[in-house]
Amino acid sequence: MKLLTKANRDLRRRGNVRRYTAILLSLIIWILMCECGAADSAFRYEVAEVHPVAGRQGICTEAGYYWVSGSGTLTKYDADWNLVVENTEPFDGYELEVNHIGDIDVYHNELYLGVEYFMDGEGKNIQVAVYDGDTLKLKRVFPFRSDTGQMECSGIAVDPDSRTVYMTSWIDDKSSEYLYMYDLDTGDYKGKMMLNPGPKWMQGIACYDGHLYVTSDDGDADDLAPDHMYRIDPSQSKETGTVLLEKTFDDVIMQGEIEGLSFDKERGQFLLLFNRGARIVAGMPAGFYEGYSEEIHEVFVYDMTEAN
């Protein structure tokens, strides 16, 4: 009994240390951003709508349609958020074993996905995959460069202006200090952009108005500490990117896990996929918070106005 009690105390102590470390890291990042003048957002955001969806990972929009990714699903919605089509077996056709989709993007009715095999906070067999926007079926796969240092893929974004596909890494190591770039037309690896300072636990990425935006799961739901979005100003060479604090998500229904993002250029709106109800440990569900028996996935639609 004494040994069991001591083990429980040790587990509780380690859990508290991890929690306090996460809070401290969030505070340090926030202070660094503010000292760099990064508290000045490019836009103001006001929640206009909230829609429940059938996926917990990513969101993108084009031509009046919305696409949502789950860890192992793809779903398309119309302009009124009615279900159009769903693919519950999106991994058909792969040569390497994969089980996880992150944040997604769309360009000319083709969906761009970062696909991998993800387990216990680690990723492998990473691939850049392109799906048909109507059928949600796999069309082609980019050749992935395994020597770039990228250890995971949490999100993907298409920049038509520079013909670049950007990828993020969620794992909290050296690989998450960069964005990884591929050529939109050829699929060739173009290099990586070092982020200064590097956000932690990046979940999604999107391109808008000449900037890159990333969401970071750098809050702590246990302590109601919110997650954040950062704006990235790339250098002309795209070798480095200056990271600025864009938004603190203290306006969601309940603190949980931030995920993918997208910008609706036609409507001037910002879209955020956010999960609540489930405890997440090392990127994996580990039970539920009080009052929840399942995880709830929602897209928050924000109206945007220029801040300056």
Tell what function each PLM region has.
Residues 73-78, 120-129, 174-181, 221-233, ...:
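Structural motif
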Residues 71, 116-118, 169-172, 217-220, ...:
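Short loop/turn segments immediately following the C-termini of beta-strands
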Residues 83-118:
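Blade-loop segments of beta-propeller domains
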